[in-house]
Amino acid sequence: MAYLKIVLVALMLVLAVSAMRRPDQQDQDISVAKRVACKCDDDGPDIRSATLTGTVDLGSCDEGWEKCASYYTVIADCCRRPRS
């Protein structure tokens, strides 16, 4: 019975916090592009001294971008714009 009370209180807190968000904040969160840098194969052997020229894209690379890392992940790829 104590676990049920804890779960109910936690759910009520989550509901209260989510209700306090302004509606315009939700629209802004969706439109913001979040990018994370990643290491391409030709950036160098050491991750500490490498310049991270790639960008993590969920799924596969966007149109006009190329995959720049040889390792394979199901969730995301390390991509960059093609060099001229």
From Swiss-Prot:
* Keyword hit for Isomerase: no
What highest taxon heads this organism's lineage?
Answer: Eukaryota
Gene Ontology cellular component terms for the protein in this record:
extracellular region; nematocyst
What this protein is called in its record is Delta-thalatoxin-Tas1a
The family this protein is said to belong to = Belongs to the sea anemone sodium channel inhibitory toxin family. Type II subfamily.
Q: Which SUPFAM superfamilies match?
A: Defensin-like
Subcellular locations according to the entry: Secreted; Nematocyst
Which stretches are tagged as propeptide in the UniProt entry? 20-33
Q: Which cysteines are joined by disulfide bonds?
A: 38-78, 40-68, 61-79
Q: Which GO terms describe its molecular function?
A: sodium channel regulator activity; toxin activity
Signal sequence, start to end: 1-19
Keyword list (alphabetical) reads: Cleavage on pair of basic residues, Disulfide bond, Ion channel impairing toxin, Nematocyst, Neurotoxin, Secreted, Signal, Toxin, Voltage-gated sodium channel impairing toxin
Q: What is this protein's function? A: Binds specifically to the voltage-gated sodium channel (Nav) and delays its inactivation.
InterPro entries noted in UniProt: Myo_ane_neurotoxin_sf (IPR023355)
